[in-house]
Each structure stands twice: as C-alpha cells, then as structure tokens.
Amino acid sequence: MLTSETQNVWTQFLQFVKTRCSPAAFGNWLAPIRVIDCSTEEVTLEIPNIFVQEYLLSNYKKDLCAFLPVDMSGEPAIRFIIAPPQKKIIPPNHFSISSSQKEEQSPNSDVKLNNNYRFENFIEGPTNQFVKSAAMGVALRPGQSYNPLFIHGGVGLGKTHILHSIGHYIKENHKKLRVQCITTEAFINDLVDSLRNKSVDRMKKFYRSEIDVLLVDDIQFLQNRLNFEEELSYTFEALKNKGAQIVITSDKPPSLLKLSERTIGKMEGGLVAHMGIPELETRVAILQYKAEQKGLHIPHKVAFFIAEHIHNNVRQLEGAINRLSAHCRLLDLNITEELVSRTLREMLQQAPREKISVEQILKSVAAVFQVRVSDLRGSTRTKDIALPRQVAMYLAKEMINESLIMLGASFGKTHSTILHACKNIEKKVASDETLRRQIGMVRRNIES
C-alpha cells in the first residue's frame, strides 16, 4: 500500500541524488519513475522502459539500499513494472506520410538498420558507458535531450552499433517518427545523383521536411568537400529548427575535423561524447558474448589471453572469434591457449612500439578532452584548457624518458612549469575519479 510516508522517502531519495547528477540525467532517468506500491519488504516502481531500471541499479544501488528496503542478499528490494505505452503527441511539423509515399520519396541513401546492433547486446564498460547513457537518453526523448549527439572514437569501437541501436529503439517505441540512417558517403552520392537528375529540390525537401530523426555515420568523410558540407550543414540547421533529432558519428572530435567553423559549431552545440578503447575486462566480456553467439566455449583463461593481445578494437576481436570458430568446427578442436597462439598468430603479433612523442600525447589529450592541439600549446589559462595541458605534461613525464628541461622545451615551457603541472595532476588524480578515467583513456589511446 502506498502511503505518504513512502512517497516522502522516495522524494528524499530523489532530492539526494539530484545533487549528484546533471539536470539532464535527472530529467531523463529519474524524474519519470513513479512509486506504485510499498511494504516493509518491497517497493514497486513504475518505469518507462528497461533502460531506466538498468541506469538506476547501475548508478544508485548503494543509495537505494540506504533509503528503501533490502532483501536477504543485501540488494534493494524493488519490483519494477513497465508503464503502458503512451500515445506520442507529434508536433504539427512532424506530419506523417504513408509508406507508399515514403518509398517513393526516400532517397537511395537510406541505410537498413543492422538487426544485431541493439542496446541490449551492446557490451558496456567504463570507456563507453557515457556514450551508451547519452544514446539511450536520445532514444527515449528524441529531439529533447541532447541535440545533436556527436559520438567520436577510433575504428571498430561500436559507434555504428550505438547509432543503429538508437534507430531501432525510436522506430519501435516512437512509431510515428520517421528515422533516416545514412553514411556520409551515401549522402554525397545521393546529392550527386540528384544534381545529375535535376531533382535537388526534392532531395532537400525530403531531408529537411520529411525526417524526424537523422542518423549520420562517419561524418569525417565530409572533410575537404566544401559544397557537400554546406548542403549537409543547412540540412542540420533545418532539422534542428523543427525539433528533429540528429546523431552523428566520427573518428575524431568536431574540433579536429577539417570543416568550417560554422559546421563545427553546430556539432559542438549539443553533446559531444567520446568512445574509447575497451579495457581488458570489457574485451573479455565481448569475446565471451561473441563466442556464445556462435556456440563456442572459450575458457576464461584463454579469453583473457586473447583480450590481452588483441586490444585495438572490437572488430579485431570479432575477427578472432570467426577464425577460431572455423578452425574448431572444421577440424573438431577444443579452444586452448596453444590453438589460439597457432591460429591467431598474425593477429596476436605486436608491432614494435615506436617511441612516444609529445605530439602523440597532445593529440590524444586533445581528442579525449575535446580541445585543440594549438590551444594546448598556447598560453590560455582558462580551466578547460589549463587542465588538459597539465595532463599532457604529466603524461609526457610519465611516458617519455627525457629530462624536465627537454620536456619543457617541447611544450615551450620551463622545467619548473612541467614539475608544477605534474604535482598538480598527481594531487587531483587522488580524489577525482573522472580525471583518472580520462587520463586512463589518453594512455590507452597512446599505447594502442
């Protein structure tokens, strides 16, 4: 039975966590939760979808135990029920068109969403947790959370998986919204065809008026193509003005793309999220999941061995599983460390490590902290530049076998400036978990 006392306890919990998360996170994940029932043994919460349950338990389990009943195992005693779907009220500019019209009007660039790329089978870890949370926020509330959402990271880390997951979720849960998923190359080809067929106006109308969600993969292919960039930039502006959701992926952050300041500004106007290289435990989880999909059993020790030697991206791990699967099925073999060493010999070989340079460190720091290399080399003292600059100096001292005087010269600073930066970062790292993770991401990017 729901009492005012129960409601007060839940309100106190919300007030407590509100001070520990951003307003956007609170609005997306916590505000929609309703207390339905409560006893001394269990609380029933109504949630809009399974992602909210996952977010709540992943981030606030200890806090929930402090406010709500706990079960015999010390876990929060909560029963979750999914709220019945509500009818989506579409703004006037989100007019609907029939499927026959869609077929007739949709350009050839539409990418079919990969059915295997869904939130449910995306393996989450520290380096991609933020990206997944942001993507789920966008999928839950298209056009209202982060717009545009810009996801960047290296090749084969799961950017396309997340992009297609957003598309699937919106199509299944916001059925009246029209989703268009394209690669940048496909958009360019579509525009070329439209110019050739003298149907540019029709293409512009489609992209700017008849789409509610635009998912764009690999925006880096727009570099050095000024006319195409201009067209896509106008499309972004038109969609943003009418409240449509835009999600973009790239192999580098907006600040490092060779695009106009105007286009970069639009991309940086929403949320920029970095997807890093998965750490060892996540790579092992990915391996085990991919193997399970193929009916393979990989002993935990062997999975760790593979993950320790293949760490650049997820795609390489998938390739390793495919090769092992073929050998095991064709030759009727069990997976052992010896078989892995023999079968994946070329994949496990590590290229000789080049000497790490200050330039490498600066580029990696710039990518993770979303600043320009030129700013890191400059003298600006604003916090958003000064902190990453000090991180670069700290990592240079850690990773490069040079004297402080030589490192100072590389940064255009004195050796005492380098020393001060290192001491400052060492002090901050002791208490700042976010900074520790960011430094870890930079280090992994450099070492890989």
From Swiss-Prot:
A Pfam family the protein falls into: DnaA_N
Binding, ATP: 156, 158-160
Region annotation Domain II: where it falls in the sequence: 76-111
SMART domains recorded: AAA, Bac_DnaA_C
PROSITE patterns: DNAA
The UniProt record lists the keyword DNA-binding: yes
GO molecular function: ATP binding; ATP hydrolysis activity; DNA replication origin binding; lipid binding
Keywords: ATP-binding, Cytoplasm, DNA replication, DNA-binding, Lipid-binding, Nucleotide-binding
Principal location: cytoplasm
Gene Ontology biological process terms, A to Z: DNA replication initiation; regulation of DNA replication
Region listing for Domain IV, binds dsDNA, in residue ranges: 329-448
Stretches for region Domain I, interacts with DnaA modulators: 1-76
Keyword DNA-binding: yes
Localization: Cytoplasm
Assembly: Oligomerizes as a right-handed, spiral filament on DNA at oriC.
Protein purpose: Plays an essential role in the initiation and regulation of chromosomal replication. ATP-DnaA binds to the origin of replication (oriC) to initiate formation of the DNA replication initiation complex once per cell cycle. Binds the DnaA box (a 9 base pair repeat at the origin) and separates the double-stranded (ds)DNA. Forms a right-handed helical filament on oriC DNA; dsDNA binds to the exterior of the filament while single-stranded (ss)DNA is stabiized in the filament's interior.
Domain-level remarks: Domain I is involved in oligomerization and binding regulators, domain II is flexibile and of varying length in different bacteria, domain III forms the AAA+ region, while domain IV binds dsDNA.
Protein's name in the database: Chromosomal replication initiator protein DnaA 1
Native source species: Protochlamydia amoebophila (strain UWE25)
Organismal lineage: Bacteria, Pseudomonadati, Chlamydiota, Chlamydiia, Parachlamydiales
